[in-house]
Design a protein with these regions (language model features):
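FMN-binding flavodoxin-like domain, especially the glycine-rich phosphate-binding loop
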Residues: 24-28, 44, 53-169
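Generic beta-sheet signal
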Residues: 3, 44-45
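N-terminal beta1-alpha1 ligand-phosphate binding loop
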Residues: 2-26
Length: 169
């Protein structure tokens, strides 16, 4: 199985998740930022984005839009990374990503992220300080990454791709 994991990231967590996912899907796997994808000649294309200010990165939605016709001919899965505080919104984010994706997405992975306000740029830091203040919560480093969840998703993708291949025979 030849897999491409295309993603964008602001501070590196989505790249970490992409690497873990590449290990989990096994077979030949390439990882690329959406801006650097040169080909979609893969059995499976997995597209990932962090969620910032209640939306996936525009670079990822633009990638889905720009490559929509080619992706309609591919097995596609999606994943996104978000702060655990936003759990109740996860289905909303999944649906938003699906709006840009082919209609027959194999699966959508939802993964907790890592958040450390000290590494943010000034604009993002102020945005997050305001966010925590509105929630009435005190800022702390949050690490909700879980490699086991990512590995399970990778195995699920392998299974779904095998099923998809069997149904076309």
């Amino acid at each position: 199985m030849k897999t491409l994991i295309a993603y964008d990231t602001r501070y590196g967590t989505t790249a970490t998740i992409a690497r873990w996912l590449c290990e989990a899907v096994a077979g030949e796997c390439d990882i690329a930022n959406v801006a650097d994808v040169a080909s979609l000649d893969y059995d499976l294309v997995v597209i990932g984005s962090p969620i910032y200010t209640d939306a996936p990165l525009s670079s990822v939605t633009q990638f889905l839009h720009d490559h929509g016709e080619a992706l309609n001919q591919k097995n596609v899965a999606l994943f996104f990374v978000y702060d655990e505080l936003l759990t109740e919104k996860s289905e909303t984010y999944a649906e938003e990503l699906r709006e840009y994706a082919p209609p027959d997405v194999l699966a959508v992975g939802i993964f907790g992220g890592y958040f450390d306000i000290s590494v943010l740029n000034e604009h993002d830091r102020h945005t997050m300080e305001d966010f925590f203040e509105r929630l009435g919560k005190r800022y702390e480093v949050l690490d909700h990454r879980n490699k086991d969840d990512v590995v399970r998703f990778g195995k699920l993708l392998r299974e779904k791709l095998s099923e998809a291949r069997r149904s076309t025979i």
